[in-house]
């Protein structure tokens, strides 16, 4: 039989799912990792921990699928949390952890961009709201407050690009992820010169933009052996998790919106052309060059639920572990018994 594997590089875990070609789930695996909040407004992850979670989750589903010799994995395709940033030196050694979308240390610099009017100019070309989540703002923070790291940095990638670099030694970024950086012109599908000038970067410090359908073959023999797949298994770059969520629930027709709540939340619609809000309130990210996802986010979704579980419901968390059930399922069941109009 033929199979596909879907991978989601999420904020708190990496998930891999093995499907048959009828869409039936054959096996799945999720591997978590911490979000480091060592300082105020910090929200970082360890790229090595995420890479190891990917390898472990892929290994799990391949083993659980019990594939026979004549079975074939036609491809491994990715979705990824957007807006992450990692700085590398000339030898591709990471100089930072993964600075995630949830990191707010660049707030000062996003506000300066807004107040100067330059932010609106950049937004009108990139479709990314001027916000501390965007790599545009993160780069300004690095440039001004982490100058030693900034000066040593020769490459800037997101988490998915780091994964592909580890597996294939490539330096590419799909246009969906690129469109969420605040550095990418969504009208000419290339890095925006004004954004590069403001951050002090050159194009060769950023990955080559590619279509979400771009395929890599010839992965590291070491990791192919660990996972249990052929070296020439196709790996597809895929796109950002937000745009792909619309595709996943088939919310791609005019007038159809998708609401998703993960660690964060958003409401999105799909259009055939980029749509820019004159007041800079909405985002416009690529699904591919012919489909654009327009919407608005909220930065606290499931993240709030996790905080409540970890800080307010220790007893329920322990009870769930003893019962062998998911702690979120237990809390949801308890919450469902609260009558309507209970004021919280």
Walk through the language-model features, giving the residues of each:
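Short beta-strand-loop/turn "lid" adjacent to the catalytic site in phosphate-handling enzymes
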Residues: 65-101, 129-135, 164-185, 208-211, ...
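N-terminal glycine/serine-rich phosphate-binding loop of ATP-dependent small-molecule kinases
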Residues: 1-96, 124, 152, 224-225, ...
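Active-site core segments that coordinate phosphate-bearing ligands/cofactors
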Residues: 5-6, 107, 114-131, 137-172, ...
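Glycine-rich phosphate-binding loops at beta-strand->alpha-helix junctions
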Residues: 13, 211-219, 239, 265
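A glycine- and small-aliphatic-rich helix-loop capping segment at beta-alpha/alpha-beta transitions
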Residues: 19-26, 88-98, 145-147, 252, ...
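Residue-level signal for inorganic ion chemistry
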Residues: 23, 46, 76, 103, ...
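Short beta-alpha connecting loops at secondary-structure transitions
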Residues: 38-41, 96-99, 285-295
